[in-house]
């Protein structure tokens, strides 16, 4: 399966589905695996009900998948308003599409795209149609995450025509596979819960071990670059702050202008501040003092072939790229090559710089400043000061205000009358409040977003957590390697070591509170659970790691450095440039409570599995440092293995539940509970690999603590591939890099 995901990358989805996932030999492999499991159960005489039920659930799921493979069909029907259709197009093996007859007729009555108020961001797609079967007619309606079922056929909203007069519905008929598969999911959930609470199960037996009773796991105590900005003119800080309090339509979302200023500054210079200037002052500088700021070396140019070829400094101005001696826009010829297929690193850097320069040009033209709302008939539209307003509903007074107010501000700025500028900006805010309708964010959302913009939570927390994690881990390792002698109870270093876990726990708690505030602010601002993109899932994963570390630290002090390190790592990943922290409306298909459950459960599982990785890594380091014959080493390795296994069982349960909740969501959203997407495949691989560790009784290598730790350390690579490899290399439906 792993190889198939790489083949798909280079040969395409249709090829790998026809040659691997849909082939007879692949189905046969699953059948052989199921038969071997049955033979093993019979041979070992496994009778514990929870274990039997768990493996039975997998057999039922495989049976459901087989029924779906053999008996189901999928297709699509294209509808136009007022036209009757009685055929659909079915996908057949080999990638062909065949037109087939429907057992009833369909007629599209209407199709609507619903938008978030005041924006062009789609909130939902709704198709209303009638089904005529013989002499009976019934009305039906489908939208994203709202399926209509008639007889054995399920209808899903798939796409629509550009003229808004047509809709494409996906069809799926799977009367046998879905109920059997869902029954398997239900059995899986029950069996996983049963395994965790079964007094005779492996998980509960871990709590009865001698090491738990003796507390052996307590052997460990705990385990923006400054810029030389010039003195370019801009608005005073207080006036610029007033500018930032205005609302703007940005990224298909109405938000404080401060948010746009922060993103504008980040994109230009790589950080939220430029020298002593606030983001609002940087934005105001380019708006009102464009010539001065075009000469300011604010644009960050990374090391690479572009800097080498053009002999550019690390910080350039806008004017640097416009040189009459060199023919005007010096990036022009290279940009033309980029759009003709030259996608090497040099030309990608050219495109990146051009993107930032065009942003500055559009700002100076005023097209980015959509700060003037007008509401008519319950619909709100936001305009920029230079926009050609063709809407006849906008009266002349509003039109003149929109077109002239920035010129008025510019005149006051040139005169240095910043008090008058403040008054104009206050009136603009009142204008927005009077004309913005329901598109305006609430006062709570505005306050939350301004706080969120002012505090770089992820940046601060990743540095703090990684630093504290390294310090605490070093202290713990030193104590393991050079234990404190107990014959001198009054030694000051012993008292210090006793205080370390208390202080570490308090600091981790403070870090958790700060991250909770960060997530809560994003939740308030976005009006949705913040788990829809890579940045947000990294925050959530770090949050779960810290919660688990604090809970586990009451018994296992080693959990503290583990919690700091892993949460710091996840926050570092969220901080890097590859992830975009902007808050936006999510796609309609993602507006489902099942998605929230799916992501949160998976993230909890990943958090637990990441801690098992740290356990394994620590064990390997101890073995390398202390050697094979060190006194007490075996006991320490056993203690780490016990902690790792205590984390493993709930992690597997959560991963299994998360995967199959995701399958149910997929079936509700687009009619296929399993599509062999790269993320699905690697999620299944991760589950199967970690499940091997739960079968230590059948694998001699895993019975030894060191062997177990080596396996768990290597198993973490599957998790890394599931999250990062798919997002940044393989791609697919689940890629949100």
What is the role of each PLM region?
Residues 1-737:
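Solvent-exposed, non-transmembrane regions of integral membrane proteins
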